[in-house]
Amino acid sequence: LRRQRQMCIRDRNITRCMNNLEQELKCTLFLRSNKGIALTPEGRQLYEHVALAFEQLSIGEEEIRQNGELEHGLVSIGASENALRLILLEKLELFREQYPHVRLRLFNHSTPQAVQALKNYAVDFAIVTTPISIRKPLQKKSLLRYREILACGSKYKDLATAPISIHELQDLPFVGLAEGTSTREMYMNYFMENRVSFHPDIEAATTDQVLPMIVHNLGIGFYPEPLAREVINDGKIFALQLKEPLPQREVCLVTNSSTAMSTAVKKAIEFIV
C-alpha cells in the first residue's frame, strides 16, 4: 500500500511537471488517450534535444566516476632536473604501478620556470629545488634536504686530500650552470658572501652536462652529493673538503591554492609527499 501511494504521488508530480512545461512553452507536447501518451511534433522536436543532453550528461557522470576511481586522468608536473632525479622519478614509478591509466605530463624546467608555469596554470604542481621565492597563493612543502659537493676530476685530485678554502681555488677553471637557474643564483650569493668572484669558465645548460665535464677535467664544479656517490666510489671524481660550508638545499613541492585539484592530481601528490 505504501509503495502504491508513493507511485501515485510520483505520477501526479510527473503530470504536473508536464502540464507546467506545456504552459511555459505555450504548446501541446503530449497527446493523452486511454491507450497512453504520444508525442506531438513539437514534443518529438524537444525530445531529440533532451535525449542528446541526457546522453552527454550520462557521459559526463561516467567520466567523473572514472576520474574518481582513477581509471583515467592527467597530471601535469613542472620539475627541475635535480628534483626529478633526486625524488620524483622514484615516486612516479610507484604511482604508475598502482594507477597505470593516469597519464603523466612532465615539463623539465628550471626552478623559476616551473614556478612561473604554476602561476600561469600550465602545470598542476611543481617539484623544484631551493633557493625558491614564492608568494601566495603559491605554497611550498619541503620533501628532501641534501647538500652539494665541489667535485674535481683526476687532474685535480690532489686538492681533495685536505680541507681547502674557496679562496685557494680562484685560479682554477669552474664548470657551472647558466644564469636564470636557482643553482646559479645560489652560488653567486655563496661566492659573494665569501668575497670571491664567481665567473664559470664553462656554462652548462643542465646538471647532467656538468658531471661529464668534471670527469674529463674541463673544470671543477658543484654537484648534488646523493647523485655523485656512485661516480665517487668508481674513482671518476673526487670531493673537495671546503672550509666554507656550502648551503643546504631542499627539494620542495609547490602548489597553487587558487586552483582546484583533480582526484588524479591529489593522489599523485599523496604519493610524492
Predicted segments, located by residue:
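A short LG(V/I)-centered, amphipathic sequence patch enriched
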Residues: 20-39
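Single conserved hydrophobic/aromatic residue that forms the stacking wall/gate
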Residues: 1-5, 9
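A late-sequence structural motif
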Residues: 87, 238-273
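Hydrophobic hinge/microswitch elements
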Residues: 110-123, 129, 182-240
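Central regulatory/effector-binding core of bacterial HTH transcription factors
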Residues: 72-135, 204
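Flexible hinge/capping segments at coil-to-helix
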Residues: 137-174
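Secondary-structure junction motif
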Residues: 158, 173-194, 261-265, 269
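Alpha-helical linker/hinge and terminal dimerization helices associated
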Residues: 24-25, 46-68
